[in-house]
Amino acid sequence: MEKRPEDTRVVVGMSGGVDSSVAALLLKEQGYDVIGIFMKNWDDTDENGFCTATEDYEDVIRVCNQIGIPYYAVNFEKQYYEKVFQYFLDEYKAGRTPNPDVLCNKEIKFKAFLEHALSLGADYLATGHYARVDRSGGKVRMLRGIDENKDQTYFLNQLTEDTLSKVMFPIGELQKSRVREIAKEAELATATKKDSTGICFIGERNFKTFLSQYLPAQPGDMMTMDGEVKGRHDGLMYYTIGQRHGLGIGGSGEPWFAVGKDLEKNILYVDQGFHNPLLYSDKITATNISWVRSDIMKGEEISCTAKFRYRQEDHKVTVRMTGEGEAEVIFDEQVRAVTPGQAVVFYDGEECLGGGTIDDVYKDGTKLWYV
């Protein structure tokens, strides 16, 4: 039998933003025994000694005092550096475009932090993610958030039913606009705070400047597949397949896009046209395949839909397992700018089935020059 809310301890991961603030407020109003915990994963003190984490923690303190719940901070900087940031650098070094948020959720928020919460006697860990957990029928399923524009299951694709059985997403049933309203009605300190964007450890800083501190850039030629040099690139790691901005190629005609990379020769391939055939593929291989429920992949393959980047429409695909955690994903129709290193995430209607990491990209049986 389930415990009553007042006998159920929920640790809320609080970032200092409006979403996690409202998540904590709703749980408190529902009668749960709530503790707010701020996670520090990165030392982001800038050259002027300003640290956004300090400001965020102060907002957490204000909100927790308003709601009337205890709070404190935990530090996962070491784990984050080893498990997430090192991977981020290695992927860029390999010419790929990683998604650190997926790994942060898998290794830090819903592993290291979840273990910490359970050690405090918590029954559940709650976060301000826009996603839902369905516990009906004796199964644990992850569903998209009600707000389609904010749904974050893409970044949560590596979570399993075991983890999700201990997780709550209190705002997953709400529209973002309603979350803001609730915060304003309760006069929470974070009610009008703007949403954070971008990668957490880069913050508002320039991406190129940040990356160059860790990886020396190697400029090289930008050329067409026919070998016509169109300019110089600043370093392959700064460009992603399908990128238009920052190429600096002038002239008439359609805009230019990054359509391929040659890591060995340090060449960035470019061509004109948003719908350039070089940007389209029909199959990928994927690694790190993880299914939310153990009963999803019963046979060799399943038909479902997939997203190859956040906020992209769903595409019909067939997923064929080829080894432990490895799969071939065949598209019903060609898809534009599928990028190695990014997440591929599988869906069946509202349900997020799981996902993996895009490895190689193919078209008509030929591997494309995407890394």
Curated annotation (Swiss-Prot):
InterPro entries: MnmA-like, MnmA-like_C, MnmA-like_central, MnmA-like_central_sf, Rossmann-like_a/b/a_fold. Disulfide bonds join C104-C200. The keyword Metal-binding does not apply. It comes from the Bacteria. Residues 150-152, 309-310 are annotated as: Interaction with tRNA. NCBIfam families: PRK00143.1, trmU. PANTHER family: MITOCHONDRIAL TRNA-SPECIFIC 2-THIOURIDYLASE 1, TRNA 5-METHYLAMINOMETHYL-2-THIOURIDYLATE -METHYLTRANSFERASE. This is tRNA-specific 2-thiouridylase MnmA. It comes from Bacillus subtilis (strain 168).
